[in-house]
């Protein structure tokens, strides 16, 4: 099954009005293949700024997080309805930095994922192992556990993109080899086929999210189960366009 190549750009807690304008303007003027979907995730305070600047139908805007309640006394949180209200269509959930620094458990991520999907946004669901877990050779057990928590709450995966992000590679400059990533992605797809169906598994896009950049993105070009990238630091730089075009 042909899956549309997907590039996500997670700006994290970086950027200003000026720098985000520069990034969006660069995308507005870039050559983007028609068969590529691009989603950028600026900080929440700049979501409507990015939406207003964006001129490309291939480019959508995402939040980096959302709470699992519609409204209420949850100081500092953003609801899915608020995210939709400013024009964003996606949300990143389960990112390792949320799991690590903000103590988000598999259960919390699953609840957020179900609530976001039920509320009408699409989800980039992040999973991945730490260095310690990698050294213990339990990568597959970890990602399957993380997926299983969501599978218990979400049956329809039409609007879910999975991002495999080896935590040991994020922001370190280290990266899994294309071959290693392909092996993990294939195992993830087989797990989804077992738990859902072959058709669903073959339709779900699985991204690589560990220090992808303009130089190493092309090495993943012929990997059948690598359907794109969730890019961190490189999404703030001109090389983000190179990553978008890495399958051309």
UniProtKB/Swiss-Prot annotation:
The keyword Repeat does not apply. Pathway: Carbohydrate biosynthesis; gluconeogenesis; Carbohydrate degradation; glycolysis; D-glyceraldehyde 3-phosphate from glycerone phosphate: step 1/1. Substrate binds at residues 10, 12. One of its GO terms (molecular function) is triose-phosphate isomerase activity. GO terms for biological process: gluconeogenesis; glyceraldehyde-3-phosphate biosynthetic process; glycerol catabolic process; glycolytic process. SUPFAM superfamilies: Triosephosphate isomerase (TIM) (SSF51351). Keywords: Gluconeogenesis, Glycolysis, Isomerase. HAMAP family: TIM_B. NCBIfam families: tim. The keyword Ribonucleoprotein does not apply. InterPro entries: Aldolase_TIM (IPR013785), TIM_sf (IPR035990), TrioseP_Isoase_bac/euk (IPR022896), Triosephosphate_isomerase (IPR000652), Triosephosphate_isomerase_AS (IPR020861). It holds the Pfam family TIM. The active site is at 95 (electrophile), 165 (proton acceptor). It catalyses: D-glyceraldehyde 3-phosphate = dihydroxyacetone phosphate. One of its GO terms (cellular component) is cytosol. This is Triosephosphate isomerase. It is an enzyme of class 5 (isomerase). Homodimer. Belongs to the triosephosphate isomerase family. Its EC number is 5.3.1.1. Disulfide bonds: none annotated.
């Amino acid at each position: 099954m042909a899956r549309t190549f997907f590039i996500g750009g997670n700006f994290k807690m970086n950027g200003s009005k000026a720098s985000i304008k520069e990034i969006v303007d660069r995308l507005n003027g870039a050559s983007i293949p028609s068969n590529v979907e691009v989603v950028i995730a600026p900080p929440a305070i700049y979501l409507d700024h990015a939406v207003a600047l964006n001129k490309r139908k291939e480019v959508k805007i995402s939040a980096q997080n959302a709470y699992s309640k519609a409204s209420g006394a949850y100081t500092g949180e953003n609801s899915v309805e608020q995210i939709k209200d400013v024009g964003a269509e996606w949300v990143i959930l389960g990112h390792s930095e949320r799991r690590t620094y903000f103590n988000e458990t598999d259960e919390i991520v699953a609840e957020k994922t179900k609530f976001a999907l039920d509320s009408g946004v699409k989800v980039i669901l992040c999973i991945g192992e730490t260095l310690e877990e990698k050294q213990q050779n339990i990568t597959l057990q970890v990602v399957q556990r993380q997926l299983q928590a969501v599978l218990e709450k979400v049956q329809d995966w039409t609007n879910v993109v999975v991002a495999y992000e080896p935590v040991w590679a994020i922001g370190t400059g280290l990266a899994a080899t294309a071959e290693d990533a392909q092996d993990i992605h294939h195992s993830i797809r087989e797990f989804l086929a077992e738990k859902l169906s072959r058709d669903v598994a073959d339709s779900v896009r699985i991204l690589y999210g560990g220090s992808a950049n303009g130089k190493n993105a092309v090495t993943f070009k012929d990997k059948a189960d690598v359907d794109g990238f969730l890019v961190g630091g490189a999404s703030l730089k001109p090389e983000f366009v190179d990553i978008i075009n890495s399958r051309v």
